[in-house]
Amino acid sequence: MSIRVDGRTILEHVNASVSEGEIVTIVGPNGSGKSTLLRAMIGAVSPAQGTVQRASGLRIGYVPQKLALDAALPMTVQRFLGLPKRISARDAINALDIAGVPDLRSRQMTKLSGGQFQRVLLARALLENPQLLLLDEATQGLDQPGAAAFYQRIEQVRRDLGCAVVMVSHDLHVVMAASDRVLCLNGHICCEGSPNTVADAPEYRALFGSGTKGTMALYQHKHSHSHHHDHHHAQDNTN
């Protein structure tokens, strides 16, 4: 798959797939095409070449990079979760519980901390019981312990729902350790594999240095499950 925006090539010859129950992290420098790849996966961006193939009826949950709310507009968490269509209190509580914040339903959105706000965005993405959960810089603005706690919750969500997870992040040492597979992107896939494999790859070290590997051990993810059936596949049909 290749993507061009305003005549400029953003992604070129990307071939990747996501399997059921798998946690995949996309890392790369600013401008490397990470968010563009996620937008292509949800259908918001069309490839200039190649295709994005989705499993029939695939349910996708999406947590955006940023969401600005008018501070002067009163809005409870329940009301926010019910946009654009209302949901029951039971559904809201269930989604918030899975996201790890069961007591926020009546709180004002503008009164939430950064970590709470991100958990509510996660709850909103979980309302449709997704088979594929996409997170674009979901911990932006959180401190390191907050980011680590968020990614631990994502692992729990994967266990509870059995969904595949694709994350874009700059929290390299935290998010890579929480992953089954890492894609290092810089306009194309530079390298991919297990977190340790990618951390040792010369292409990765050329972009990020060698400091990631030691800190990854603090948040090591346990690979105790298997992955079956591709949910999503991006393919470049050009030669």
Predicted feature residues:
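Helix-to-loop junction immediately C-terminal to a conserved catalytic motif
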Residues: I42
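Conserved ABC ATPase "signature" region
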Residues: A89-L104
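Conserved ABC ATPase signature
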Residues: Q108-L112, Q116
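Catalytic Walker B motif of ABC-type/P-loop ATPase nucleotide-binding domains
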Residues: L133-D136
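H-loop/switch region of ABC-family ATPase nucleotide-binding domains
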Residues: S169-H170
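H-loop (His-switch) and adjacent beta-strand-loop-beta switch element
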Residues: V182-S194
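ABC ATPase nucleotide-binding domains
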Residues: D200, F208-N239
